[in-house]
Amino acid sequence: MRMLVLKPPFIFEITIIEPHPIGQDMEWTRSGEDLFVRIDSGDEIHASLQRLADEVGFNAAAITSGIGRTRDTLYGYMNEDGVYIRRQLDSPSELVSLSGNIARKQDGTAFTHIHCCWSDDDNNVHAGHMFQCVVHVVAEIHIRILKHAIMTRCPLPDVELLGLQFS
């Protein structure tokens, strides 16, 4: 798709925005360092975004927003002892907010750290660290690539969390 962008003093700039298929049911489009991703039914969000990082070839990104409808969700929080407490949300629910980041682990594999808020069909809100989440209908996610950043996930002593190191 070609898009005409008018900028004062009305110099014409043409930006080419093309959709890119990835996997079986995910597509994305790119404009500069911004990616907009559509993940379809049945795909797990972490796995899809990790595949995207490998396909596009970036090492660091901010996941700025996400919405959709999901199911089979495992989420939770870290308690005062550094242990994650996990909760299951089996029924389909609205993904009302998603944010986080994408970095690389020490072995080079992509790692996603995501926090979310979901609303069930009774409008009860569930929120926390997302361990697993399958798309029920669709998820739409915005990602900003941090092309000059180096972010590495490293084990931290005495907690389940992989810490974020900048180098």
Language model features with spans:
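Leucine-biased recognition of intrinsically disordered, low-complexity hydrophobic segments
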Residues: L4-L6
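N-terminal intrinsically disordered, cationic/polar leader segments
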Residues: F10-T112, C117-S167
